[in-house]
């Protein structure tokens, strides 16, 4: 097993996750099996109770693990399925060690950070690195480990110390360290500054880790003189200084690393059993990157949510939209709308914001209402859903978005003016959305319906069923405490709101579609978590197709895109492969 540790310096949020994912991608394209671990030095057990403003979105895994959004990057880049133990937090490690101490496993010893916490970290990494993450079930050969935060943070000290010991335990030829640092370029001088990187590497060396590659994040490509200066002061060869400047899309990052000889370096440094030249997989990335840069037509989607000031709050949603837009050869324009701005009360308090929000909504090609929690802004979302339904605008509601679509329909079509979710109005006489039996009101963490669940289609006459390849069922990831009340199902269906997908027991409403509408769909699950660059998520793909007016044509053709719309578009591509790469959708395994 080979281990690659990715650390960061100067500032957090520098792009360690994308660098780690890209390193994994180029190694996977060389034929290796790659897994990844994300270490978060916070004391929370998991990311489940975070505010989206605090740490971005909460990413959900197959096993129900609520984890850091970087694990979403790993899954999308490497097309793998991770588990909750691939996200290691200080809280998890301390809980693990304290539980062992309570059981008497330390035989009366004084339990300390060194060696007990550091040993537990090393054991966890070595154990988790061997868990298969690919569909073929083979054991990984390389484990990419991203250490969150920046070098020097007091929280990450036990982890740095653990890896200082770890490099000797697994031997030098099996461990290497990539250090990601910032090279700022102040606008006043226009000169690229190396001092932050020098200080960051010096601090890392002082803690006992020596970087093998120094990856410099910068706005423009590094000058040769700057590279040589970093090489001299950071005690690495010039070819070990890698420049990752700002690029048009993240699909370019693996290509950027490969062009600078990263594969050759790993080949020598880690003695990897691979060919020098990454093959077919990187050609797909090159095609995607080239294709992304050539897009001319634009499709605009109004994203009506609560956390729109911070795009990381909807990271997977945005990626799912991008994957689908790329698949139909369109540039994506997301119009972020704070749902509270659409509410009538805003028209009195801040009329300009109110009119700007409605202007954005009315000018969009499609409307998306993603998941969320809490009552703030829900009336604005209901207004947006009503507008999309009445104006025949393509609409997708995810999780809370689906629940509010049912609330809106109940109020405006069935005439139940007080219809609501018991989350927002516990005393309503028409509780069309109710909390689930699993929900434990006394505790917040881990009390939701989480992870991959099966949904069965109830009818053959369904747009969503066709988008999923006419399958009998689908398996997607969930994260919710509330659900549509099955008591009102008959009343809603009689008026045209059809529940075309339900859970295996037939008790939970999973997919809703409106008759006589171009595309009005709600899903209780979160399809964005399984979207991949080459395998877009069907609900998002349907929304994008409907938004550009191509959905009915696509369904008539048996759910096949025209050649100009698939990844077989090879204009300007020098790929040696002759086969056509069809667009794929999440695999449905029939038992």
Curated annotation (Swiss-Prot):
GO terms for molecular function: ATP binding; CTP synthase activity; identical protein binding. Residues 562-591 are annotated as: Disordered. Residues 300-554 form the Glutamine amidotransferase type-1 domain. One of its GO terms (biological process) is nucleobase-containing compound metabolic process. Pathway: Pyrimidine metabolism; CTP biosynthesis via de novo pathway; CTP from UDP: step 2/2. It comes from the Eukaryota. Its EC number is 6.3.4.2. It catalyses: UTP + L-glutamine + ATP + H2O = CTP + L-glutamate + ADP + phosphate + 2 H(+). CDD domains: CTPS_N, GATase1_CTP_Synthase. One of its GO terms (cellular component) is cytoplasm. The active site is at 399 (for gatase activity), 526 (for gatase activity), 528 (for gatase activity). Keywords: Acetylation, ATP-binding, Cytoplasm, Glutamine amidotransferase, Immunity, Ligase, Nucleotide-binding, Phosphoprotein, Pyrimidine biosynthesis. Activated by GTP and inhibited by CTP. Induction: Up-regulated in T-cells and B-cells activated through the TCR and the BCR respectively (at protein level). It is an enzyme of class 6 (ligase). This enzyme is involved in the de novo synthesis of CTP, a precursor of DNA, RNA and phospholipids. Catalyzes the ATP-dependent amination of UTP to CTP with either L-glutamine or ammonia as a source of nitrogen. This enzyme and its product, CTP, play a crucial role in the proliferation of activated lymphocytes and therefore in immunity. It is linked to Immunodeficiency 24: A life-threatening immunodeficiency, characterized by an impaired capacity of activated T and B cells to proliferate in response to antigen receptor-mediated activation. Patients have early onset of severe chronic viral infections, mostly caused by herpes viruses, including EBV and varicella zooster virus (VZV), and also suffer from recurrent encapsulated bacterial infections, a spectrum of infections typical of a combined deficiency of adaptive immunity. This is CTP synthase 1. It comes from Homo sapiens (Human). The gene is CTPS1.
């Amino acid at each position: 097993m080979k281990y690659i540790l990715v650390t960061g310096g100067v500032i957090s949020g520098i792009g360690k996750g994308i660098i780690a994912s890209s390193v994994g991608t180029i190694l996977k394209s060389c034929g290796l099996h790659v897994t990844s671990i994300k270490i978060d030095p916070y004391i929370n057990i998991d990311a489940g109770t975070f505010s989206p403003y605090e740490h971005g979105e909460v990413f959900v895994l197959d096993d129900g693990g609520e984890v850091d959004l970087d694990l979403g990057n790993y899954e999308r880049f490497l097309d793998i399925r991770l588990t909750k133990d691939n996200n290691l937090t200080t809280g998890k490690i301390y809980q693990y060690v304290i539980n062992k101490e309570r059981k008497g496993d330390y035989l009366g010893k004084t339990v300390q950070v060194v060696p007990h916490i550091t040993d537990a970290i090393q054991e966890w990494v070595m154990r988790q690195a061997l868990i298969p993450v690919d569909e073929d079930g083979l054991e990984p050969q390389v484990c990419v480990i991203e250490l969150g935060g920046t070098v020097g943070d007091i929280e990450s000290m036990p982890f740095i110390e653990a890896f200082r010991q770890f490099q000797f335990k697994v031997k030098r030829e099996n461990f290497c360290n990539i250090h990601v640092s910032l090279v700022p370029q102040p606008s006043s001088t226009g000169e690229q500054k190396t001092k932050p990187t020098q200080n960051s590497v010096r601090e890392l060396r002082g803690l006992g880790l020596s970087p093998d590659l120094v990856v410099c994040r910068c706005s423009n490509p590094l000058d040769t003189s700057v590279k040589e200066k970093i090489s001299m002061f950071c005690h690495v060869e010039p070819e070990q200084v890698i420049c990752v400047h700002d690029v048009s899309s993240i699909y370019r990052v693996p290509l950027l690393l490969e062009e600078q000889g990263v594969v050759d370096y790993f080949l020598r440094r880690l003695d990897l059993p691979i060919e020098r030249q990454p093959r077919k997989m990187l050609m797909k990335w090159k095609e995607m990157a080239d294709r992304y840069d050539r897009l001319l037509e634009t499709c605009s989607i109004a994203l009506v949510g609560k956390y729109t000031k911070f795009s990381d709050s909807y990271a997977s949603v945005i990626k799912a939209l991008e994957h689908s837009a790329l698949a139909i050869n369109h540039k994506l324009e997301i119009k972020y709308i704070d749902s509270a701005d659409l509410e009538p009360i805003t028209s009195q308090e801040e009329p300009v914001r109110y009119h700007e929000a409605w202007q954005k909504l009315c000018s969009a090609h499609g409307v998306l209402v993603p998941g969320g929690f809490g009552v703030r802004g829900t009336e604005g979302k209901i207004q947006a859903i009503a507008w999309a339904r009445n104006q025949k605008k393509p609409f997708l509601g995810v999780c809370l978005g689906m629940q509010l679509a049912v609330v809106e329909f109940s109020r405006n079509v069935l005439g139940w003016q007080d219809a609501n979710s018991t989350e927002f109005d516990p005393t309503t006489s028409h509780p069309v959305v109710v909390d689930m039996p699993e929900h434990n009101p006394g505790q917040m963490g881990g009390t939701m319906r989480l992870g991959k669940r099966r949904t069965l289609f109830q009818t053959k006459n369904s747009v969503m069923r066709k988008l999923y390849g006419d399958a009998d069922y689908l398996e997607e990831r969930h994260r919710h405490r509330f659900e549509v009340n099955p008591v009102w199902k008959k009343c809603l269906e009689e008026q045209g709101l059809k529940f075309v997908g339900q859970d295996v027991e037939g008790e939970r409403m999973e997919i809703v579609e409106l008759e006589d509408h171009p595309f009005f769909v709600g899903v209780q699950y979160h399809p964005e978590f399984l979207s991949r660059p080459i395998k877009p998520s069907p609900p998002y793909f349907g929304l994008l197709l409907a938004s550009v007016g191509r959905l009915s044509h696509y369904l008539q053709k048996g759910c096949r895109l025209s050649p100009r719309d698939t990844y077989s578009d090879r204009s300007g591509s020098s790929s040696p492969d002759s086969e056509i790469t069809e667009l794929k959708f999440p695999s449905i395994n029939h038992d």
